[in-house]
Amino acid sequence: MSSADDHCALAFQYLDDDRLSDSEACFRRALAADPDHLLARTQLADLLLSLGRWEEAWPLNRVYDGKPRPDAPPVPFPEWRGQSLAGKSILIWPRFGLGDQIMFARYFPILRAMGAQVTLIVLPMFGNVFDGLDCNVVHAADELFIPPQDYWVYSALNPNRLNQSLATVPANLPFLRTTPLVCDLPPGPKVGIAWRGNPVHANDADRTFARSNFQALEGLGAAIIPLDYEVSGATTLAQTADLISKMDLVISVDTSTVHLAGTLNKPCWVLLPKHRTDWRWLRDRSDTPWYPSLKLYRQTARGDWGTVMAQVVADLRAKLAKAM
C-alpha cells in the first residue's frame, strides 16, 4: 500500500472507534501524500458533512471538475457544475438511492428560480409520485426520448453545486402525488413499519434488521402495518406513499420509506445504525433539518438494536397513552 493508503486505513479505524478528530487528521495526511486519493477525498467529505461542516466538504467531492466524469449518463450535453442557469435547460438524471431522489427534489424550485427549465427522469418504480412537481417529468421506459438540454446533473449533487449549508436547507418539501392502494386496514391507531432497504447498499448489513425486531411493538394498542412492498402489495412508491398517508406513525430503518414519510410530513421514527451512519443524519442529535416530522433513534453500540427498540417501545407506549 502507498503512504496515502496507510493513512486512509488508519482513518477508518479511528472512525469506527468514534475518534473523529484523529480520523479527520489521518484522511488529511492521506491527501497530503496524494491529493488525488479518491477514497480519502470522498470519505473526508462524508465525515465533514456528518459534522455539519458542509462548506469544507463540498470542494472535496468535486473530484471530476475539469475532467470527464466516468459515471456520466449517456447524453451528449455537459454536466452542470454551478454555471448560470438563466435561460438554460437542465436534466435531472436518476442515480444513487431512491430516498436520495425524493430528498433532493426540494432543490428543483431553486434551479427554476435561477432561470432554468427543469426536466426530471423518473424510474418506473416511482410511479406518478413526482408528477405534481413544477418541472417536466419524463417517465423512463425502454425507449427513452430525452429532449436536448444545456446541462445534466444528478439530483444528489445539487446541494453541492448550490453550496448549501445547514442554515440553508430548503424548508419546503416537494409535493408528492400518491396512487391509491386497495387494502383492508383495521380501525384504531396504525403504525407502519419498514425493516430493510436496498440489499446492495454498502452499509446494508448494519442499517437493515430482522422483521422480528418489531414484534416488541405488538400488544401496545396499535395495529402494526408492514410497508415493505413485498408484504404490502404496493408496486410503486406512489402506492407506498398512499399507505403511509393512512398511518398515524411510521417506524423505519434508514430507507426510502423514511423520505416518503418525511416529505408527507408524517411522524416517523428513524432507526439508525452506529456503524457508518449516513452523513445526512449528522451526529448526536435526534432531529434533522431535512424533515421536521422525523425523530432519530441511534444505536449506541454496533449491532445493538435491542436498546434502540426498548426506547422505541417506551416512547410508543407513552404516545399511545396520549391517544396519538
Language-model segment annotations:
Residues 1-324:
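Catalytic machinery of carbohydrate-active enzymes
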